[in-house]
Curated annotation (Swiss-Prot):
Top-rank taxon: Archaea
Function: Bifunctional enzyme that catalyzes both the deamination of dCTP to dUTP and the hydrolysis of dUTP to dUMP without releasing the toxic dUTP intermediate.
InterPro entries listed in its UniProt record: dCTP_deaminase, dUTPase-like_sf, dUTPase_trimeric
Species: Methanospirillum hungatei JF-1 (strain ATCC 27890 / DSM 864 / NBRC 100397 / JF-1)
Gene Ontology MF terms in the entry: dCTP deaminase (dUMP-forming) activity; dCTP deaminase activity; nucleotide binding
Name used for this protein in its record: dCTP deaminase, dUMP-forming
Catalysed reaction equations from the record: dCTP + 2 H2O = dUMP + NH4(+) + diphosphate
Site feature location: Important for bifunctional activity: G114, W115
Pathway per the UniProt entry: Pyrimidine metabolism; dUMP biosynthesis; dUMP from dCTP: step 1/1
Record family assignment: Belongs to the dCTP deaminase family.
Any single Pfam family the record assigns to this protein: DCD
Amino acid sequence: MILVDWQITDRIERGYIGIDPYNPELIQPNSIDIRLGNHFVWYTPGDEIIDPYIRDTVTGGTEEMTAESIVLHPGQFVLAETMEAIRLPDNIVASIEGKSSIARLGIELHQTGGWIDAGFAGSITLEMCNVNQRPVRMHAGMPIGQLVFYTTERALCPYNAKKDAKYLNQRQATLSRYYENKKRA
């Protein structure tokens, strides 16, 4: 079941869902708006192949900055953080969706990483890309996406109980940590 406005408000006010900072004006009929943070990371152009299993290729060749705005150029891919940190209980999951007004500027908010497991805590890393033909300036603090909450049965092993929870309590845009996975044949 998707939570509606009064259910989202109730669960936040009772501390069942954590949103920090919380602004009740961001509650929508079926979601809560989330805002762009001010930490950004991106890969510099180059020919070195990124191998998800090799840490140095994943973490090398990057730049990062903290700024009040960033210009996304056509085709540019940037990791960004949400201003809000969230905390989910073991029976609520969330998905992140881009706001249509941002999408109409050609900005994709996430590539495929839009699912947030029960038990997750931290800021959300956004996988932003500009598919417009023109550069677009994005400002820290602007509403950029929406979190939709779904109730589920209680997870036996929520994200915060997993030994390999790579992104638990992240508080800035975080590069892939796929290299921490065991390689499977």
